[in-house]
Every structure is written in C-alpha cells, then in structure tokens.
C-alpha cells in the first residue's frame, strides 16, 4: 500500500464520517433511528451506490465491528446504574437466555419454510438474528424517560443476551461444518457455561483490576480514558480467546467502573461519549459498504416476511414466555418490551461467522441478517416514540443539566458541577434563593444573568434565562430535577403523576373521608402503603399505578426503592359531570 492509497483512504474515510455527522439531524426530523442514517451513507458509498466503492473484506468488517461494539458496551456499562438490577436483573437474564432460545427456534422454523432450508440451517438463521443489539438499544433509548422496570430490562437484556446468540451460532456452525461434531447434552452445557461463566468472571475480575489500576496510579487526566479503553479491550479479547463472551465481559467491566468511585470517571465518560459516536458511525458505515443492495432485492419479499414474522410472532412469544414468572410486568409493558427487540450490528457480525467458515448459503445468511436489521431499525426504531405513548411506559421527562463536570478535589471525588438554564415555565422563576430548599449538602456556586456573574444572596430572585451552577453529587440529581422541573410539553404527561399527592404513611380512613370513599372493615385500619403493597408488590417503580374505588393511584415518588408519595389521578371533568347527572 503506497502513500497515495493511504492518503485516499484517509480522505474517503473522513468524508464519509463527516457526511454521516452532518446528516445526523435528519434522523430526528424524519423520525428514523440515527443508526439507519449511518447505514444508508455506507450503502450509498458502496458498489451499488453513487460512491462505487467495492468492499467485500469480511475479516476487516468483523474487526471493525467488534472493536466498535466493545467501545459501545464499555460506555453503556459505565452509564448503567447497578441499582436498576433490583427490578430488572432476573427478567433480563430470562430474556437473554430463554427469550433468545425461543426467538431463535421460532424464527428458524419460519426461515426454514420461507427459504427451503434444512432445520439446522433455518435455526442458524434464527440464532444469527435472535439477540437484541446493545448499540441500537442504547442509542435509541438514550435520553428517553421510560418506566425504570422496562427501560432497565431492555438495556440489561441487550448487554447480556449476546453470549446466548454467539453460543447457538458457533455451535450450529460447528455442526453444519463437520458431520463429526458431537452434539451431546454435555457438549452444549459446557459451551453454554463457558460463554457465560468465563465472560462474567473475566468481566468482573478484570474490571476490578482495571478499577484498582486507575485509582492506584496518578496520571495526566487524558490518560485515564486511554487506560480504561485499553484495559476494557484487553478483557474483551482475553475473554474471547478463552472461549467466553467478550461482549458480556466488557459490559460488566464498564458496569463495575461506572458504579464504583473511580478516579476521573467523568473525564473517562466524556471521552467515551465521543468514541462511542465514532464507533457507531464507523461500524455502520463499514456494514453498509459490505452489503450489495441489488442482492437484497432478490430476497426482499421472503426477507420482509421473515422480519415481520420475527417482530410480530417470534419476539412477542419469547417475551411473554420469558417474563411469565415476573408478575410485576403488566401486559402493556410486555408488549412494549416485545416491540423494542431492536436488531443492529450484532446480527450482521454473527452473519460474518458462516462467511468466514465457508458454509453453504453463507451469503444468504448475511443478506437475511442485514435485511432483518434494516426492517427492525425502520419499523421498530421509527415507531419507538409512538409505542412508548401507546404502552403508557413514558414518564414525564426529567430536566437534565445542560452541562455537568466532575470536580476532582480528591482521587475518588463524587462531587460535580451541574449547570442549569432556567426557562419561563420553571416554577422557581421569581422565587428568592432562600426558598429553593436545596438538597442537603448541595450549594449554588454561581448565578449568571445576561452573561454577567452575580453576587447572589438569599433574597436574590431568579429570572428567566438565569444560569445556575450547582455543586452536588449524582445522588442529588433526582431532587435537583424536581427542584428545577418544568411543565411537560405533552398534555397527556402534564398530570401523569396525579392531581393530588398523598404521603405513603397516610391512613386509608383519612383518605376515604377526604375523597368520599366507602371502605370495608379490613381497609379502615390500613395505611396507603399497605394498599400499594397489595396492588403493586414489593418493588414498584415510578409511574406504576392501579385502580381502586374508581380512581387511579400513581407512584409519584420513590426514594431508595421505597415509595414515599402516591398521586391521585381524578377522572376527567366530563366523566365527573356525567357521574353527577
């Protein structure tokens, strides 16, 4: 490779990345996932597009995709709160194992019928497209305010279900590639345990060692992110080399780093944010270049039937079976989890395995995986907002700081500087600072008005457009969000948590007198918390609700997994007037 070729490679790569970045706002305007934009740019640059770039190097695509996926999962793990495992761990594990197996089998049977494949070949297609994709799920759910039970389940499932898909894919390739492969129960159990066991062990052990190294060594701030990424990639590669799931390992490594006091954690996250975007762009550009659109047209109708069958048939059945033991999930939540079974880069990466193994029909497997991913991103990704609204799993958005910066006053400092911009519809406009009732231990470090630094006192009244700099810790974000809350843009969310709020310790007898409810003898001595326990169980999440005496009772506030306030949602005025008549 001469200097001219290398320079041309840099120019074309930079041009494609730049175009992808500049076209990213199109996704929000058209209501399509941003990953689809990156994929489309790659396809347009390919041999059937205007770029006429011929690219069919599957090993290079496999390398780029794995590198990108590792970075995306490291970032996703660091941003996942381990507290969410309380409500989502076992449901996620069930979906990541049993759910993937059921999806694989049902999709495989459909593929066998549509494409005249053998049973094992059809199930291989099902295994390739059987797992949800972490890159797609993290990207599309990022910044959305979802019911925590649902959101955490989807994210943890996408980060942990790849070992099952890899296990099934590799096993089936081994069987199809060699008639001598011993497909005994012991072999299957050992392979399954190796994928999950080695992946989990190396992820947690390696993550702890990496965390210790980061905190132990005093380095220039810019080097901590490099140490975190290089360490994560080493754990990823080592896990794969030992027969484990590198994807699971690096996700758990990120989870450990993000949930322990880690030196320069905020700096690491800031660097990872940019690297994750670059990884997503690079991965989907390469995958777009790899596919030949004209070949997809040959399988368009049966491929569409396979994708629709998986979305409307295989995935919902798998979710309902996987979540059957967990009574806390409502039917609406199960349907939403079924709908957000997003496919992305992982199925395409798995489809490269048969190509590299030289299996018959390998090109068909790859084209099918690509087609299913495209349909999933367009149909499921493009309708995500509508699905959230229909399933009623959307919560009123919590205002995020426009900026947050770690304050490294000591190596494992958890102090941050949160910056809020006040809008006209925030309740605190016109209030003096002394009336804000800031969370204990937090301080307003500075107030800016018209780009001028003020010298505020307790009597200083806040105005629209003021910028507040608040010293606090991550645990204070919830309280600060309530403090600087604003009216939701959607009318349907304006009274989401109810019209009136009651303390969880309130007696039902007092509530009944206040709202004219007729209680039975057993209910008279109970408290509101007993009612919540009876209807919602021990782990309700924000936004859960139940019907009682013709009214809706909504979990309006949760602190340390304990409900503290219940919202009472009254019927609309029309219904009240009809009842009065």
UniProtKB/Swiss-Prot annotation:
Residue spans crossing the bilayer: 3-23, 30-50, 58-78, 87-107, 109-129, 195-215, 232-252, 271-291, 304-324, 335-355, 364-384
pH dependence of this protein's activity: Optimum pH is 7.75. Inactive below pH 6.5.
Compartment list: Cell inner membrane
Membrane topology: Multi-pass membrane protein
Gene Ontology cellular-component annotations: plasma membrane
Superkingdom as given in the UniProt entry: Bacteria
Keywords per UniProt: Antiport, Cell inner membrane, Cell membrane, Ion transport, Membrane, Potassium, Potassium transport, Transmembrane, Transmembrane helix, Transport
Catalysis performed (reactions): K(+)(in) + H(+)(out) = K(+)(out) + H(+)(in)
Pfam families associated with the record: CorC_HlyC, Na_H_Exchanger, TrkA_C
InterPro entries for this protein: Cation/H_exchanger_TM, FAD-bd_PCMH-like_sf, Na+/solute_symporter_sf, NhaP2, RCK_C, RCK_C_sf, Transptr-assoc_dom
Family stated for the protein in its record: Belongs to the monovalent cation:proton antiporter 1 (CPA1) transporter (TC 2.A.36) family. NhaP2 subfamily.
Job of this protein: K(+)/H(+) antiporter that extrudes potassium in exchange for external protons and maintains the internal concentration of potassium under toxic levels. In vitro, can also catalyze Rb(+)/H(+), Na(+)/H(+) and, possibly, Li(+)/K(+) exchange, but not Li(+)/H(+) exchange. Nonelectrogenic antiporter that exchanges one cation per proton.
Protein name (Swiss-Prot/TrEMBL): K(+)/H(+) antiporter NhaP2
Organism: Vibrio cholerae serotype O1 (strain ATCC 39541 / Classical Ogawa 395 / O395)
């Amino acid at each position: 490779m001469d200097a001219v070729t290398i320079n041309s490679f840099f120019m074309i790569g930079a041009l494609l990345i730049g175009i992808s970045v500049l076209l990213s706002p199109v996704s929000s305007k058209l209501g399509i996932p941003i990953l689809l934009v990156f994929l489309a740019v790659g396809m347009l640059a390919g041999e059937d597009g205007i770029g006429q770039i011929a690219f069919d190097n599957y090993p290079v695509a496999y390398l780029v995709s794995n590198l990108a996926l590792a970075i995306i999962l490291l970032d996703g793990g660091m941003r996942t709160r381990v507290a969410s495992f309380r409500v989502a761990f076992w449901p996620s594990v069930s979906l990541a194992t049993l759910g993937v197996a059921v999806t694989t089998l049902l999709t495989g049977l459909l593929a066998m019928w549509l494409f005249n494949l053998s049973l094992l070949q059809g199930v291989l297609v099902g295994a390739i497209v059987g797992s949800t994709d972490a890159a797609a799920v993290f990207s599309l759910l990022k910044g959305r305010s979802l019911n925590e039970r649902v959101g955490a389940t989807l994210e943890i499932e996408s980060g942990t279900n790849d070992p099952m898909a890899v296990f099934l894919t590799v096993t089936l390739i081994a069987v199809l590639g060699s008639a001598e492969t011993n497909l005994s129960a012991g072999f299957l159990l050992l392979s399954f345990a190796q994928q999950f066991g080695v992946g989990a062990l190396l992820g947690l052990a390696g993550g702890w060692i990496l965390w210790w190294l980061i905190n132990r060594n005093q380095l220039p701030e810019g080097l901590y992110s490099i140490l975190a990424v290089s360490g994560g990639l080493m754990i990823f590669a080592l896990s794969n080399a030992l027969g484990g799931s590198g994807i699971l390992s690096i996700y758990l490594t990120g989870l450990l780093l993000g949930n322990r006091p880690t030196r320069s954690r905020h700096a690491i996250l800031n660097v990872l944010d940019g690297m994750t975007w670059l990884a997503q762009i690079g991965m989907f550009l390469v995958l777009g270049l790899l596919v030949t659109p004209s070949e997809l047209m040959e399988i368009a109708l049966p491929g569409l039937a396979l994708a629709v069958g998986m979305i409307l048939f295989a995935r919902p059945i798998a979710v309902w079976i996987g979540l059957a033991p967990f009574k806390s999930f409502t039917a609406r939540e199960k349907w939403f989890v079924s709908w957000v079974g997003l496919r992305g880069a992982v199925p395409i990466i798995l489809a490269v395995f048969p190509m590299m193994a030289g299996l018959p029909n390998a090109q068909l497997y790859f084209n099918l995986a690509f087609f299913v991913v495209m349909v999933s991103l367009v149909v499921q990704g493009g309708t995500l907002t509508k699905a959230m609204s229909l399933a009623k799993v959307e919560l009123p958005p919590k205002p995020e700081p426009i900026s947050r910066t770690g304050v490294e006053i000591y190596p494992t400092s958890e102090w941050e500087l949160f910056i809020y911009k006040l809008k006209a519809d925030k309740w605190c406009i016109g209030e003096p600072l002394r009336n804000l009732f800031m969370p204990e231990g937090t301080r307003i470090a500075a107030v800016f008005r018209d780009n001028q630094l003020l010298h505020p006192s307790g009597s200083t009244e806040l105005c629209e457009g003021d910028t507040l700099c608040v010293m606090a810790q991550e645990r204070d974000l919830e309280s600060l969000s309530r403090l600087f809350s604003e009216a939701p843009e959607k009318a349907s969310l304006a009274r989401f948590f109810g019209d009136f709020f009651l303390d969880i310790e309130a007696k039902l007898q007092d509530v009944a007198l206040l709202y004219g409810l007729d209680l039975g003898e057993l209910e008279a001595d109970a408290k509101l918390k007993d009612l919540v326990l009876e209807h919602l169980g021990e782990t309700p999440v924000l936004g859960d609700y139940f019907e009682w005496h013709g009214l809706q009772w909504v979990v309006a506030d949760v602190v340390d997994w304990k409900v503290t306030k219940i919202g009472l949602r009254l019927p609309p005025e029309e219904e009240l007037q009809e009842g009065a008549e």
